[in-house]
Structures are given as C-alpha cells and as structure tokens.
Amino acid sequence: MHPVLQSVRNASVSAGGPHQQQPQQQQHGVSSVRRPPSPPRYPAQHAYPGAGATPTAGRGDFDGALDPDEGPVACGLAAGAGVDEVRMRERDAARRATVPEINLFKARRDVVPNGDYERDLMYHSGQAIDIDRQRVLTPEDFKGSEPAFTPAVNHMRAAELKRAAEQTAFGEELRNTCHQTRIRTALLRPEIGAGIYYLYDFVQTYLEHPDGRVKLNPQLVLVAQHAGNTMLAQRLWAIAEEKNAWLRDLIEMAYMIVNDPYLNTEQQLSAICTTVVELSMKYAKLAAKNGYPSMAQMAKAQEFFYRVMQAVLDLGVQVGVYNNRPARYRQKRMSEIPQMTDAEYMFGLTQALESRPPQGESFADEGPSESDDEDDFI
C-alpha cells in the first residue's frame, strides 16, 4: 500500500477505532500520552504519526495489525523491481522529456505534415546547413522586431532541421545494414540452396501444369504454412495469377543468385541488393504519378522489396531443412528389440525356404558357364 494511503488508513482507524470507547475522564483533565509513530512496515515506507498502533504494557514494541495478504508497497527502491530490462528500456524511450527521433522519409503525416518532395528538400537542406553546435543562446538573441524571426528562433529551427537530417541518414544507414545482415545470415545457411531450388521448381511446376494443381495443393498448403500469417503467404495462395508475376520473378532471381557456383557470399549479397534496388526503382517510377519518385518513395519501395526478399530466403531455409536434417539412426538396446516366439520363428523360416531355393539349385539354374562355351566353340 502506498505510504499516503497508509497514513489515511491509520488516521481513520485512530479516529473511529478504540479511541471512542475510552473513558471520558481523559477529556476532563487526564492528560493523554502522546503515542510515538508506528515503525515502517517496509523499508520503502515512511513512519507517520497518529498510527493505529497501541503500545503494549512494559514494552516499547507496537502491534501494527499487519495484513499478511498485502504485498510490499510499490514505491522507493521497491518500485519497478519486477520490470525486466526490455520493459525498462521501453519505458525510458517513451519518456516525454526525450527528444523523439524523426525520419523524414518514413515519418507519419501527423509528425511531419509536409509532402514527399518537400521532405526531400528538408533532408538536403539539413545536410547542407552548417551550425555552431557549441553556441549558447543569450537573452539578447530572443530580441527582434519579429518574434518569429529572431536569431534564437532561426538557430533553433536550423538545429531541428539539422538533427532531423542526421537522424534520417543514420536511420537509413542502419536499415540497410540490418537488411544486409539478415540476408547474409540466410545465405550462409546450408539449407538455402535446396530450399530455394525446391521453391522455384514448385512454382514453375504449379504454373506450367494447371491441370495438376489439385495434386499440388497439399504442397502449396505446406509451403504457405511455413510462410506464416504474412503477405508472402497470401501471395503464394494465388501465385499462378498474373498480378503476382513480380513475385515469381523475384523467386527466380533468388534461385539464380543462390545456386550460382561461381559466386561467393559477398557477391551473392551484392547481386541481391542490386536486384532489390532495380525492382524498387522500376515499380517506384510506375507508382509515382509524374514518373519521378522522391527519395521518400524510393526508401519505402526498397524497404518493401528488402522485406519480401528476406521472407523468400527465410522460406527457402525452412523448406530446405527437410533435406539437410534427416532423422538420425539410433542403435536400439537388446531389451528394446522385440523377441520372436518359436512359432513366429518357424513360420518365418518356412517362408524363407519356400520363397528362395537352396544354394545348390541356384547355381544349377544359371546359364551356361564359360567352360561350356569353350566346349561348344571347340
């Protein structure tokens, strides 16, 4: 219980508890003894005077009528004791006093109300601005004929624009690094080759044989189940439709890059990044109304194709596990081997004798030997 609530509770107990049943002689002249404050129940709780603890005769101890069902108070050192490190970092990141990070290319409209092309200008302006990072504003800097155009206001706006541009550049660099790390990790997995080969072959077979799709549907269900509840799984259900031709091309490019024997891991990563950039530029131009996409639109398109490529490679890894991890043979113990009865053994022996002829007859049934051939030749 919070210390403030505990003090209110103690005051209410002292006002309506055993004090009303005391003899009236104390009100006519008998001086009441001032009770010392009750000891704190927990280390984080302070002691408040007027507590409902009555001193015992001859001792300085106090019986505070503790409730065993109540847990420790959530204040002081006890506050946040059950919060793990991840939640503590989330709580610290969500503080109102922290300066929020702004990505000019991907921020929401309520954060950055400007358009895509205006965001490009803000980014380039922030990169070109050179401000004094050690400048300290003085009261004279806030003086001016126009309150919105003073040296202090101009410096603050320039600093905000510079910070937003630097945070945007850092965020995009971190995004590219994260995507490349995940793709490199998938390329280093030994199951990626077999998984991508199976995925590409299945898509081509499903596309070239429309009459046999009923028999291929169980495999499609298995592949889509490995994709999970994602956009890739929804696209795989309709992989044969013309609107998903871009996904078939992406799977084919991943198959060609992964199964190329002359490329190492870094070259494969470069080829995949080149494919992602080319696809993002192509479809970003088609999506833009004027045919010239902004940097914000390009960043969103690259983010989309990077995520799709990662999902395809992860799906190939999950499918390829079936070929690279067979069930290991475990030598059984003698006690685990089922023992045959005499009747079962004699039945098996009879079946073996009836199904296979004796060893001597097998040689007699064979064709003419080399000696017979030589006699005939002579």
Curated annotation (Swiss-Prot):
Segments for region (Interaction with packaging protein 1): 1-178
Task: State where it is primarily located.
Answer: host cell
Keywords from the named record: Host nucleus, Late protein, Phosphoprotein, Viral genome packaging, Viral release from host cell
Q: Which domain of life is it from?
A: Viruses
Q: Which GO terms describe its biological process?
A: viral DNA genome packaging; viral release from host cell
Report biased composition (Low complexity) as residue ranges: 16-35, 49-58
Q: Where is the composition biased (Acidic residues)?
A: 363-378
Gene Ontology cellular component terms for the protein in this record: host cell nucleus
Q: Where in the cell is it found?
A: Host nucleus
Q: How is it modified after translation?
A: Cleaved at different sites by the viral protease during virion maturation.
- Induction line: Expressed in the early phase and late phase of the viral replicative cycle.
* Extra facts: All late proteins expressed from the major late promoter are produced by alternative splicing and alternative polyadenylation of the same gene giving rise to non-overlapping ORFs. A leader sequence is present in the N-terminus of all these mRNAs and is recognized by the viral shutoff protein to provide expression although conventional translation via ribosome scanning from the cap has been shut off in the host cell.
Purpose = Involved in viral genome packaging through its interaction with packaging proteins 1 and 2. After proteolytic cleavage by adenovirus protease, L1 52/55k protein is removed from the capsid during viral maturation.
Q: Which family does it belong to?
A: Belongs to the adenoviridae packaging protein 3 family.
**Protein name as catalogued:** Packaging protein 3
